[in-house]
Curated annotation (Swiss-Prot):
Entry similarity comment: Belongs to the universal ribosomal protein uS9 family.
High-level lineage: Bacteria, Bacillati, Actinomycetota, Actinomycetes, Micrococcales
HAMAP family: Ribosomal_uS9_B (MF_00532_B)
Acidic residues: bias regions: 1-15
SS bond partners: none
Keywords in alphabetical order: Ribonucleoprotein, Ribosomal protein
GO cellular component, one term: small ribosomal subunit
One GO molecular-function entry: structural constituent of ribosome
Chain spans, region Disordered: 1-34
Gene3D superfamilies to which the protein is assigned, alphabetical: 3.30.230.10
UniProt-listed GO biological process terms: translation
Protein name: Small ribosomal subunit protein uS9
UniProt-listed InterPro entries: Ribosomal_Su5_D2-typ_SF, Ribosomal_uS9, Ribosomal_uS9_bac/plastid, Ribosomal_uS9_CS, Ribsml_uS5_D2-typ_fold_subgr
């Protein structure tokens, strides 16, 4: 009987050594996590990119998207834009916790997706600054992309494209 107990203890010790655990994982489990506030607060913000402007409301719900009266998949058929817009929720582990209601105008699909992502990130930041701001800031989702199209200059064909010049 004593021999059986020793072998089971040895097997358990061996399982602990061979299991895929890391020291950092153990440290994270030991450290108490900050409690997030209940998902009852709504947030609203404006996001801009290129010529696009997105007015966004983030409301606690089931993860439903309404963009200009249409679903996310209908408004952004491109999967890349859908993923881009969803990133702030994924990075904060809030996927499906909030409904998004947005009005977007101006620009093209890429600019609109960028504006919507910025608006969502700002809304989530407004909801819970203590927990969300550092994560969103580190990922770069709270930074407004200031790149815009350069204006056309007089005497040139485009912003920088000039007529071909022959020296001789």
């Amino acid at each position: 009987m004593a021999q059986n107990e020793e072998t089971t203890e040895a097997v358990e010790a061996e399982e602990t050594l061979t299991s895929y655990t890391s020291e950092s994982g153990a440290a994270e489990a030991a450290a108490p996590k900050k409690e997030r506030p209940a998902l009852t607060v709504a947030g609203a913000a404006v996001g801009r990119r290129k010529e696009a402007v997105a007015r966004v409301r983030v409301v606690p719900g089931s993860g439903k998207w309404i963009i200009n009266g249409r679903e996310l998949a209908n408004y952004f058929p491109n999967k890349l834009h859908q993923q881009d817009v969803n990133e702030p929720f994924k990075i904060l582990d809030l996927d499906g916790a909030y409904d998004v209601i947005a009005r977007i105008h101006g620009g093209g699909p890429s600019g609109q997706a960028g504006a919507l992502r910025l608006g969502i990130a700002r809304s989530l930041n407004e909801i819970d600054i203590e927990n969300n701001r550092a994560i969103l800031k580190k990922a770069g989702y709270l930074t407004r992309d200031a790149r815009v199209i350069e204006r056309k200059k007089a005497g040139l064909k485009k912003a920088r494209k000039a007529q071909q010049y022959s020296k001789r």
